[in-house]
Design a protein with these regions (language model features):
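Amphipathic alpha-helical repeat scaffolds
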Residues: 46, 53-57
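Residue-level detector of conserved, well-ordered beta-strand and adjacent loop positions
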Residues: 32, 52, 114
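A mature extracytoplasmic/lumenal domain signature
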Residues: 43-45, 85
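Bacterial Sec-dependent N-terminal signal peptides
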Residues: 1-23
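Structural microenvironment flanking redox-active thiols in thiol-disulfide oxidoreductases
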Residues: 60-114
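N-terminal "domain-start" segment that seeds a small globular fold
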Residues: 19-42
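A glycine-biased structural micro-motif
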Residues: 23-24, 46, 76
Length: 114
């Protein structure tokens, strides 16, 4: 029965038309930095861009340290790291200033944060 269902799903996917509507290309996207400056993705054309969802109270908070190492080592070779804090899961509380201060004092980061 599982094989029949799987086969049906595969066949059905061939006959459906994707209707994705692209209103904006990734290169047209911009962020507002934690300092209030606009970060335009298009400014980083021809560079390797790493955009990472970050939070200062999650199990992966130490990723800040690794991201800073990556940024420090490869920024002169065209790597750009952008941290995007999100409080969707209640793991990034505080104001922009508190988040910025925490990241800079705890992990010494200097890559852009939104």
């Amino acid at each position: 029965m599982k094989k029949i269902i799987t086969l049906f799903i595969i066949m059905f996917s061939f006959f459906t038309k994707g209707n994705a509507q692209y209103e904006q290309l990734a290169s047209d996207f911009s962020f507002k930095s934690i300092n209030g400056k606009i970060i335009n993705i298009n400014d980083y054309k021809d560079k390797v861009l790493v955009v990472v969802n970050v939070a200062s109270r999650c199990g992966f908070t130490n990723q800040y340290q690794d991201l800073q190492k990556l940024w420090s080592e490869f920024k002169d070779k065209g790597l750009v790291v952008i941290g995007v804090p999100s409080d969707n899961f209640r793991q990034e509380p505080g104001s922009n200033k508190e988040i910025k201060d925490f990241c800079e004092t705890t992990f010494g980061i200097d890559f852009p944060i939104t």
